[in-house]
Regions:
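Nucleotide/phosphate-binding catalytic cleft detector across ATP-hydrolyzing
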Residues: 1-156, 164-282, 288-336
Length: 336
């Protein structure tokens, strides 16, 4: 691949997506790193490491270096980024490093933004631009954010839900809460423990969420057999879980997201609120794929709610398009 490539990175709690100018999203891997505790050497990164979660011997640890949208382990994040950048652009020719745009939650502090910026430089970037996730999500969802018109984005990742009203290229009102896809998984783990005396891992909880999970009453009550460890006997056990049960399990995190949407709507200027009422609310991020979320938000707000065409890659695409926008701006400046 050519030197000096421009790339956009959606550095998420659950997964990392990389967008390359002219090629689109070229990499999507879980944000998981496995390393040997004795030697401190990395054993696996991405999908290979994710498959090790909950299944490693004592000396191997599989970790997620990002928590709730921000870096929790700087060194591991830097190594993970280096690996993904190398896989994307290969070895830089003539020492020419890529220019990289990275997104952060809208509620990230200056210190948290600086940590992401520094880690990206250390991982091999020539220049680093930071963009807020809701803005990236809006661009990736095909919204023209430069217009003087209110657009509401609800971006639900693995660690955070970012709700923002965007107009004239910037965020007018926003709210970032640390409730998202991972919290849905944790709610299912707690429910299974309390209701069925069954201990399950996060991968099993995610499978339940994807296959039968819902936050709004489904037309039909789906079922799924779930295997785990009986907390009473300590032996393996299989129970049948229904989508009705998951609605109960997921109610609290789902309503926290709805409340955050309400909070932003209440603080939105009247003219922009009228725009949102006409144009609707757009959902992005992997967490938006939970069954029934569109219907729940629409019912509670009275505003038409829709999921972006490709919610999983919207932030990555928007982050990449943002670096293209900056590149175009540079050209215009040089031509003046």
């Amino acid at each position: 691949m050519a030197a000096g490539t421009d790339i956009g990175i959606d550095l998420g709690t659950a997964s990392v997506l990389v967008y390359v100018k002219g090629k689109g999203v070229v990499l999507k891997e879980p944000s998981v790193v496995a390393f040997d505790r004795n030697t401190n050497k990395i054993k696996a990164i991405g999908e290979e490491a994710r498959l090790m979660l909950g299944r490693t011997p004592g000396n191997i640890v599989a970790v997620r270096p990002l928590r709730q949208g921000v870096i929790s382990d700087y060194t591991v994040t830097e190594k993970m980024l280096s690996y993904f950048i190398y896989r994307t652009v290969g070895k830089s020719l003539f020492g020419r490093k890529p220019r990289i745009s990275v997104c952060v939650p809208s509620g990230a502090t200056e210190v948290e933004k600086k940590a992401v910026e520094d880690a990206t430089y250390q991982a091999g970037a020539r220049d680093v631009s930071i963009i807020e996730e809701p803005v990236a999500a809006a661009i990736g969802a095909g919204i023209d954010i430069a217009k003087p018109c209110g657009n509401m984005i609800v971006d639900i990742g693995g660690g955070t839900a970012d709700i923002a009203v965007i107009s004239l290229g910037g965020v007018v009102v926003s709210n970032s809460i640390k409730v998202a896809g991972d919290d849905f998984d944790e709610a299912i783990v707690r429910f299974m423990r309390k209701k069925h005396n069954l201990l399950i891992g996060e991968r099993t909880a995610e499978d339940i969420k994807i296959n039968v999970g819902t936050v709004y009453k489904r037309p039909e009550n789906l079922t799924m057999d779930v295997r785990g460890r009986n907390l009473v006997t300590g032996l393996p056990k299989t129970v049948t879980v229904t989508s009705e049960e998951t609605e109960e399990a997921l109610r609290e995190p789902a309503y926290q997201i709805v409340d955050a949407v309400h909070n932003v709507l209440e603080r939105t200027p009247p003219e922009l609120a009228a725009d949102i009422s006409d144009r609707g609310i757009v959902l992005t991020g992997g967490g938006s794929l939970i069954q029934g979320l569109e219907e729940l938000i629409e019912e509670k707000t009275g505003i038409n709610t829709m999921t972006a065409e490709d919610p999983l890659t919207a932030v990555a695409i928007g982050t990449g398009k943002y670096i293209e926008y900056l590149a175009d701006d540079d050209k215009k400046s040089k031509n003046k």
